């Protein structure tokens, strides 16, 4: 809980703003060697608490406030759950125009319950309307990823 509280404060308080795709590497430098697909990660997460992995995936959305988180989705299965990604020690942020691009990231996948307060904060960061945000009334168990490094592939 302390980690997520810190993340809420960090997202709102950092002055650095990230936009544009001029950089390819963020955080720990990584490449595609040994990476598994997001769909393979979903299979690997069945029945376990966490997995250290290098994963490729499609970015579906990015924090529009600072770039302090992104969502990853399956390229093949549009019904698959989305994975919420944050960045180790808030040492880097993603470009705010990264949605629709493919990335490879290294770090740890895990499941965690996200509070209503945090869900509303992230919905606000994403630019959802007040009416959409008000519909958030229950905590949600989510697949999350703490990335130590990200590389933009396209």
Where do the model's predicted regions map?
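Sec-dependent bacterial lipoprotein signal peptides
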Residues: 1-9
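OB-fold and OB-like single-stranded nucleic-acid-recognition modules
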Residues: 11-154
């Amino acid at each position: 809980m302390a980690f997520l509280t810190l993340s809420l404060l960090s997202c709102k308080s950092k002055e650095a703003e990230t936009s544009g795709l001029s950089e390819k590497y963020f955080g720990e430098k990584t490449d595609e060697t040994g990476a598994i697909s997001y769909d393979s990660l979903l299979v690997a997460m069945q029945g376990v608490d966490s997995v250290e992995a290098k994963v490729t995936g499609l970015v579906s959305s990015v924090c529009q406030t600072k770039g302090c988180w992104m969502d990853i989705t399956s390229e093949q299965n549009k019904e698959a759950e989305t994975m919420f990604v944050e960045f180790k020690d808030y040492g880097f942020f993603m470009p705010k125009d990264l949605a629709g691009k493919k990335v490879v990231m290294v770090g740890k996948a895990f499941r965690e319950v996200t509070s209503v307060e945090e869900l509303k904060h992230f919905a606000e960061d994403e630019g959802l309307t007040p009416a959409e945000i008000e519909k958030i009334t229950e905590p949600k168990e989510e697949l999350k990823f703490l990335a130590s490094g990200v590389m933009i592939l396209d």
